[in-house]
Amino acid sequence: MEAGPDGKVYFAVAGGEAVDNGLEAALRTELLAHTGTGWVYVYDPADRSVQRVVGGVAGASGLALSPDGRTLYVSDLGNRCVWSMDADARELTAGGKNCQSAFSGLPGYPCALAMEADGTLYISYRWARSGWLEKNADSTLLRGIALRAGQNLQEKLFGLPSDAPCAEAVSTADGSWKRTFTGGSSCTAVCPVGSKVYFGAADSAQVLSARI
């Protein structure tokens, strides 16, 4: 969820799959099934309307607005990228007209996003890039088998090695990569405050932090 300077509230639906077993299960399902049924919506409190901003996202799991509130960034879990679009746009399709890839080929599956006042975008990673998943991207059979497997087996397909990035800081002004954060923890939330950035670690009550 992200609130703009004009009071509008943007929120994401990760995908069309049921979330009866929780958001994490829904995200794993989207990675394996790659349905591309995620949507981002905007709520306008002025007239209490809800409109669709962009669809076709393979796991819409993070949102961030540029400092001026004009550009919306959306993390796409399944495509390992972050889309950017005009915050006032409506009914877009991920990768289609007026929706471009701001950062692609990411080293992991992006989750939460956070924006600083200077235009630095923080991208957290829920899982590291899965070689097995990428190798079998076109195998409906193998993906289907993995989809029906238990949670423990599915987690082993992804994981997060100790040397894998759990988050990165990038410049939205020139696209340069400013810093990589490692720590062996899968991140579900990221929040820069002052001289530190805080990370919510998956399956943990701890809040991690790093100086910036």
Language model segments and positions:
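Beta-rich, blade/repeat-based domains predominating
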Residues: 1-9, 17, 34-39, 53-71, ...
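Conserved beta-strand positions in repeat-built beta-propeller and related beta-rich domains
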Residues: 3, 9-21, 56, 72-79, ...
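Short, conserved, GDST-rich strand-edge loop motifs in beta-rich repeat architectures
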Residues: 11-35, 126-161
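A short loop-to-beta-strand structural motif that recurs across blades of beta-propeller domains
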Residues: 38-41, 81-83, 166-168, 206-208
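Short loop/turn segments that connect beta-strands within beta-propeller blades
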Residues: 43-48, 86-90, 171-175, 211-212
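A short beta-strand motif characteristic of beta-propeller blades
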Residues: 49-54, 98-103, 176-181
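A beta-strand-loop signature enriched in Asp, Gly, Thr, and Trp
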Residues: 85-140
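Blade-level signature of beta-propeller repeat domains, shared across WD40, Kelch, NHL, RCC1
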Residues: 188-212
